[in-house]
Amino acid sequence: MDQSLSQQIKKEAQNLGFDLVGIAPAGEAPHWDRLREWVERGFHAGMEYIPRRLSTYRHPSGVLPGCRSLVMVAASYLPVPLANIPPGLGRIAAYATRTDYHTVLREKLRLLAGFIEALIPGTQTRPAVDTAPLMERSFGWLAGLGWIGKNTMLIHPQFGSYFLLGVVLTTAELPPDPPFSKNYCGRCQACLEVCPTGALVAPFTLDARRCISYWTIEAKTVPPARLRPFFDQWFFGCDLCQQVCPWNRRILRSGGVPGTESLLVVEARQLPPHVAMSEVLRASDSILRQWFRDTPLWRAKPAGLRRNAAIVLGNCLRKEMPSYENGCSNAAGRSDISPSNISSGSATPIGQLTSRSKRSPGDFPENAAQPLSPQAADWQDVLASALQDPDPCVRRAAAWALAGRPTLTVGSILHEVFARETDPEVRQEISALLSEISTASGSSAEGP
């Protein structure tokens, strides 16, 4: 194997703007057995494309027949400090605040693939950016780009976990780099402890059924009611397990890695890190497309974005309750939020959870008498309008959000909507909310 070929390929990757580059041999994917076990335990949630292509993940030849090497690259992106934001705004995960990374990285990877084919005549290549059935993080570790942390992210000593991976698979046999030699997580448990829904069920293990990022990006339905309060103001994705990682501390403090200029920063337009949720709910599909079409947010599509916005506003309304305790709690290790009771509905009622919204039935009459702030009144108006959205998931989320500040008016609106609603899941959601409002207010009125 010609070492000079590898050096030329790495140099070209750096010239194209990639921050890290390494070469991994094409063998059975490291940690494939763990992926299979992860799927068997149902941790993939609704991402059925993973078990459907599980055998393909086992070896890169399933992506490129005859593959012998993987050129792994990484492009860093800028973090967004987790500062307090005004109510009514939604947080966006840092990676999604710029032009879709698929667009930027794919073009650079095509150029790198063309360079490899010109350098080594007769070789075949295939570039990929997290859309092929390939265990990129495992091969990133194998190529020496970092270690896999307890938050399941690939972590590099200089860049932390604020980078995205790409790969060029090739039939050329290139000298491989050594795997990253050590895991520097040590005894740190910060990521497990900060996760509000307990999605990191163990070190290096993520249960997507509890993950805020899964529910706001990948899911096509509405998250379980018991999880929604823990989303707080996360509108798209979640960065909490990265924000607390000690290896990201310097990057967060300096706003990036000093002395580097990532292609994801130079060649991408900037989105604001926070978005007004009422505007998302008011916007037409065409307007949402205009705002988000070339960003990662478009993966959620208009219905998903409106669903997420409604949940954020519901949490903001709950924050206006006098009984609301504005603290940072988490569900890690809790016995009342588990895969079985999330799906079966047997978890402890929200009012009894150790969550941000500690309310009891006796609180509601007093709370209902409290005047709404002007912005909360606006949220209620836009949520009431969202009850007529054509997508049932949006209607479910809007009903739950509207009930975040239960009043006689809200009860009346929900009764009217229930009377005309035909979708069984939306009817079930509204029925449960009306029963909760009725019980909490001490009313003798019967539910629907």
PLM regions: where:
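Intrinsically disordered, low-complexity terminal tails and inter-domain linkers enriched
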Residues: 254-260, 318-377, 438-447
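C-type cytochrome heme-c attachment and multiheme electron-transfer modules
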Residues: 255-317
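Amphipathic alpha-helical scaffolding segments comprising HEAT/armadillo-like alpha-solenoid repeats
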Residues: 288-291, 373-387, 407-418, 442-448
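Short inter-helical turns and helix N-cap capping residues of alpha-solenoid HEAT/ARM repeat scaffolds
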Residues: 302, 390-391, 422-423
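Leucine-rich solenoid repeat scaffolds
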Residues: 411-419, 423, 427-435
